[in-house]
Amino acid sequence: GGWPVEVSDQIAFDTLNKAWEQGIRYFDTAPLYGSGMSEIRVGDFLSKQNRDEFVISTKVGRLIFDTENSKAVEKFKGQPLNKDSKFDFSYDATMRSFEDSLNRLKLDRVDILHLHDPDNSPDAFFHAKRGAVKAMIKLKEEKVIKAIGCGMNQNEMLSELAQLDCFDCFLLAGRYTLIDQTSIERLIPICEEKNITLILGGIFNSCLLYTSPSPRDNR
């Protein structure tokens, strides 16, 4: 999607292709990433693969819109789209966001649909439960998604969402690593009790636990 550095279409394709060659078959994206560019690039790559051979997840909770605001466009380096995003956890916005994602991904269904960052404001959680979650349940009933998930960078709200008994999985970023293991205290036991799959993201804590090899060691 072009964050934090510019990524060309070719580099994006080569990266996805290398992952595929190494046996990776789960791909996660979101409207936020590159304001739609990530979904377009992932969709272009996966359109060349057998649909039954991969698992794809994307997210709802933000809508992409056209903008001439240069600062918004510059958030994602090298982004050729004049787009930005805004939070909206309403039922209608969730349905629209999902349909837009399908178009960008060139798919008629996705395997996992995550609620994305419903902790961005004090009332976001409330609106998500009344709107987005109901829309996701409807999409699952229509069999255009297989699993309902939620992706965020904190575990407290995920523990609360688990009590709704409609989530199949959570994507937790940066909260079960060598640095931060706070999810052990409450979230992981709840996931075990509720049979909710926990997907770990940001396992290197935004590269704090990882550095690229020096040119001398890069053999």
Describe the function of each predicted region:
Residues 72-171, 175-176:
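Glycine/proline-rich, positively charged
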Residues 210-219:
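Single conserved hydrophobic/aromatic residue that forms the stacking wall/gate
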Residues 1-66:
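N-terminal binding-site loop/beta-alpha segment at the start of enzyme catalytic domains
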Residues 14, 18, 40-44, 100, ...:
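Alpha-helical scaffolding segments of alpha/beta enzyme cores, especially the outer helices
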Residues 27, 57, 149-151, 171, ...:
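Structural detector of well-ordered beta-strand residues that form the stable sheet scaffold
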Residues 182-209:
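Aromatic-lined glycan-binding groove of carbohydrate-active enzymes
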Residues 32, 59-63, 115-118, 153-155, ...:
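Active-site beta-loop-alpha junctions enriched in small/polar residues
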